[in-house]
Amino acid sequence: MAEQLIQFTDRGLYCKAGNFYIDPWKPVGKAVITHAHSDHARPGSASYFCHHFTKPLLQLRLGDYPYQTAGWNEPVYMDGVKVSLHPAGHIIGSSQVRIEYKGEVWVVSGDYKTEDDGISGIFEPVKCDTFITESTFGLPIYKWKPQSEIFESIGNWIGQNHAAGKTSVLMAYSLGKAQRLLGCIEATGLPIFLHGAVYNVHQALVNAGWKLPAVHHVQADTPKELYKGNVVIAPGSADGTPWIKKFLPYNVGVCSGWMQVRGNLRRRNADAGFVLSDHADWDGLLNVIRATEAKRVFVTHGFQSAFSRYLTEIGIEAFEVKTEFGTEDEETAELKDPDKQPAQDEETAELKDPDKQPAQDEETAELKNPDKQLPEEKETADSKYPDKQPAQDSSPDQRDNNE
């Protein structure tokens, strides 16, 4: 039996013919990185290859390593293996990895979403023989409304809080949803304050040439009256810590795909939940897989067992693959343990939570039945994010990443 072009090893996805790994979870010689979230981009490898938008983020999070970069659809050769990056739409710089060797084509999706969010690049379906896909929201209860509707709901919520003299604290991961939210909030005309972890990502992107809305860094000496009626963006792990008390009186809004399940809002003890995700929903996953025309699909992190089983039932050869992806993903981290207090570094640390799927109480038991639909919540919105692309990094040998 012929050896697979990509092998599943204890270090990660390995292309033996090209002698490189894709998103390895242990140090390796050469790491090809799909995007800068920490479950896909880990320190310690000898060299890294990524999209040039990802490079400043990797530099922020991983530090000083040899980075090689490329743009989308710009092939490079690694020991005779043709490798190219293609837009994944997940976060800034996120890319699918196309690998071609001796007439065989594999695509590693990394994390992806199919809706154009105005900043992450528009997802590009890539035809292949074998497709390795995520399945974070691989159940039919997860179906997203348009970003414009979600932004309209967020804008209305912010306006109501402002009228009541309350600060709007939006919980969103520092790399991804935080940048998407800036355009929505900018449309309100209110000042925007960022938690240290979000601010660090913001500055790395601005320094790399991205045109982003003006913001303020939440600092210990910032007069508290400046926050009143305005907007704060913070990672979800900051909720329930002493840091957040400086914004009193405030309301908390959680931005997450998990808010599709009503019980999760109650567990978070938040004032509002907005179903905003940087991952594809059920329909998005299926549409992408069909568009690839892949003969075989490997399903990684998420609801991989249920999703791979469904693919098999509809006639697509699919296999479940255990990986270490998702352990510090911006979606899965948000629901780890709502009662556990994170480390409380209010200025810099991105407070980490390992991966855990939502608990299945009486309101989430529907997750056990992929064919049963859950009534959708009414959380929606609209506000265009300025689609501004930065000047491209002309250096082909540098690269960055962040979560």
Language model region names:
Residues 2-17, 21-26, 30, 36-171, ...:
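His/Asp/Glu-rich metal-coordinating catalytic cores
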Residues 12-25, 74-77, 214-230, 236-244:
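Short acidic low-complexity segments
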Residues 24, 34-39, 52-57, 72, ...:
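Short, polar loop motifs at secondary-structure junctions
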Residues 29, 46, 104, 165-167, ...:
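Short coil/turn segments at beta-strand junctions that form active-site/ligand-binding loops
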Residues 29-35, 45-52, 63-71, 80-83, ...:
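Active-site regions of enzymes building and remodeling cell-envelope glycoconjugates
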Residues 115-196, 256, 260-329:
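Cap/insert and terminal regions of metallo-dependent hydrolase folds
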Residues 193-211:
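Long, charge-dense
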Residues 219-345, 355-356, 361, 368-372, ...:
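C-terminal regulatory/interaction regions
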